[in-house]
Amino acid sequence: MDLIPRLFAEFQALLDRHEAALAYCDCIEATLLGQMDYPRVPLPPDWDGSHRYAGDAGTIAHVISSSRHRRRLQRVLQRRQRRWAEAAQRTGLTAAQGQEAALDAAVLDLADVLLTTPARTLDAVVLKLGVLLSTREPGSHAETTSPWRELRLILVDLRGLAD
């Protein structure tokens, strides 16, 4: 008996739950952004006059040489980060992000189970390769680099054989 189709159905259901959790986080965050901006501080304009911002103390330290100005910006940033964290907690964003992270880990764990389960049919190999590409490919920039390009081409070949 081939377990891959059942595992793949579970994987798809978990992936759908994860996508819904991401959308929920985005919705809460959009509401929060309607009330306040991301916690950041303005930096002096760049060489071309463009506006720059810092969202972390390291960036401030790298850009601002005056210790007094640097400390002031870092304190302002800390206050803004604290307000953001409090608002995120109050609106449920922090809890939603925790749920999303747990679902993401569960998706990857189930992908590992699926990928290590022996395939008994060509269709199961196609499903396994699809899961491998969807969970392990480094990103869209890798679509044209080896071995990801070749793995995608092999997946197309296998799908053709499976039909």
Language-model regions, residue ranges each:
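Sequence/structural signature of long amphipathic alpha-helices
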Residues: 1-163
